[in-house]
């Protein structure tokens, strides 16, 4: 069994990873009361994934500012805690992630207007749209409200916080970071003309909207070793029209030239959560419907524009054959696996790369949780996504109980 999926890949920073099947980031809520990692449940879970045979293990979302959380239990970097204490907790986390030589990177993020139950900040004072009608409006007003437009000083502060978090990850022993610029979080809000109405240096054109991301990449690069990996997660579903696609390609060229090591393609926001639900049958191209992955068509459309930049697609892969086909067709260089990695944490080692498992049985299982009746009645997709996310969080937090089942 000679799989392209099993071949090593060398990133721009010089790191060589043993295969092209990577465990993608998910919401995990492993933070303690000080927003630190390091609980036994957290470390045990990552020891399991580290022994699973993944080419790379990505951690769950880490927020760069504890005042704005993407999820209530997220790990975050609190500058009021002595750095030695924070670094000790992160080193224990990195060690757990790196068992048996595994490589791990930290996903770093700021939720922007998707921070709940606080006066959130965003590039512009544009609120979330959870759907038509009074009930979605009431829910949005209660949970998210209308964000406050950031000052330039606040933008500079966020850039600094991303760089400081990356430096912390490097000092702790992680192999790199992934900048989260997808799923409707702060950086995706800046990149999108729909949520960024600024007319200063950080808005008004595709290039200006990408400036905060470019500044973050440069700030990180100036503060970490050259061999430290810096990847980025990018939305596909924000770029449906010809103008949006043109802007997208301009931004991706700028991001690639700034010095990232890989680009992960995902999609969706709290308004339209395709990262959980996939692309709707009505909107999906026929070619997308016949493939497993949600975002392969977008990946193929940008492939020729980004020569030399490793491309990762996450979302929808469920079989060895589907994963291998994506690589053979040159749709991507890397396959990202999220929820199946919870139900089958040893998926690469025990199933996908196991010669004794035939293709028909080489399946990445995922559990689909029914949308609550109230969510269907209200017509708010985000509620259904939330129910499924909570189900998987509980599974993740109990994953360490199988640590000895090697």
From Swiss-Prot:
InterPro entries xrefs: Aldolase_TIM (IPR013785), NADH_flavin_oxidoreductase (IPR051799), OxRdtase_FMN_N (IPR001155)
Gene behind this protein: iccG
Q: Which organism is it from?
A: Talaromyces variabilis
Q: In which pathway does it act?
A: Mycotoxin biosynthesis
Where substrate binds, per the record, is at: 180-183
Query: Which top-level group of life is the source organism from?
Result: Eukaryota
Positions with a binding annotation for FMN: 24-27, 107, 338-339
State the protein's name: NADH-dependent flavin oxidoreductase iccG
Protein's job: NADH-dependent flavin oxidoreductase; part of the gene cluster that mediates the biosynthesis of ilicicolin H, a 4-hydroxy-2-pyridonealkaloid that has potent and broad antifungal activities by inhibiting the mitochondrial respiration chain. IccA to iccE are sufficient for ilicicolin H biosynthesis and the roles of the remaining enzymes, iccF, iccG and iccH within the pathway have still to be determined.
Q: What is its EC number?
A: 1.-.-.-
Keywords assigned by UniProt, alphabetized: Flavoprotein, FMN, NADP, Oxidoreductase
Protein family: Belongs to the NADH:flavin oxidoreductase/NADH oxidase family.
Q: What is the lineage of its organism?
A: Eukaryota, Fungi, Dikarya, Ascomycota, Pezizomycotina
UniProt GO MF annotations: FMN binding; oxidoreductase activity
